[in-house]
């Protein structure tokens, strides 16, 4: 702590040849820019409001088909085809994802006569093997019960 009873001169505390730095001059700032003049607001009736569009399933399929044909023909890139259809990329990929499972279900083909006969034969063999396995397991269980004296 500082000694309060010390009444020595302040000049004695500071070295006489110490480097004394002059306070640095403050930087001058340029004056602030004036605020931009606000543009007059347009009337609500003048600007057409962007209303959300709802497309039917048929319209979605048509737009997707149009985009695919443009891209496969090599006329334009995928991004350009999507923009020309008037939808966003996100919308395109969402539509593509929802339409694809429906098409995959429709593409499921039925087995032909020869394949059907093979399936029937395999199912019969599967049943026969299951019965054989069940008989073996029953015999093994009976043998273990006799050894353990449970029967």
From Swiss-Prot:
Keyword field contains Repeat? no
Out of the domains of life, which is the source? Bacteria
| Gene Ontology MF term list | DNA binding; transposase activity
Its keywords, alphabetically, are: Nodulation, Plasmid, Repressor, Transcription, Transcription regulation
Residue ranges of the region described as Disordered: 1-61
Biased-composition ranges, Low complexity, are 11-23
For bias type Basic residues, the affected ranges are 24-35
Would the keyword Zinc-finger be found if you checked this record's keyword annotation?
no
Q: Which GO terms describe its biological process?
A: DNA transposition
Q: Which InterPro entries match?
A: Homeodomain-like_sf, Transposase_8
SUPFAM superfamilies per UniProt: Homeodomain-like (SSF46689)
Question: What family name appears in the similarity comment?
Answer: Belongs to the SyrB family.
| Chain's role | Seems to affect the transcription of cya3. May be negatively autoregulated.
The protein's name in its UniProt record: Probable transcriptional regulator syrB2
């Amino acid at each position: 702590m500082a000694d309060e009873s010390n009444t020595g001169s302040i000049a004695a505390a500071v070295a006489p040849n110490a480097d004394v730095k002059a306070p640095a001059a403050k930087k001058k700032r340029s004056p602030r820019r004036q605020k931009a003049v606000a543009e007059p607001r347009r009337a609500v009736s003048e600007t057409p409001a962007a209303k959300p569009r709802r497309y039917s399933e048929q319209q979605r399929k048509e737009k997707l088909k149009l985009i695919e044909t443009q891209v496969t023909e090599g006329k334009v890139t995928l991004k350009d085809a999507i923009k020309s259809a008037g939808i966003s990329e996100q919308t395109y990929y969402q539509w593509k994802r929802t339409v694809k499972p429906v098409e995959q279900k429709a593409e499921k083909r039925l087995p032909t006569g020869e394949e059907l006969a093979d399936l029937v034969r395999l199912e019969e063999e599967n049943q026969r093997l299951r019965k054989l396995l069940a008989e073996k397991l029953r015999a093994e269980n009976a043998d273990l019960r006799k050894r353990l004296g449970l029967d």
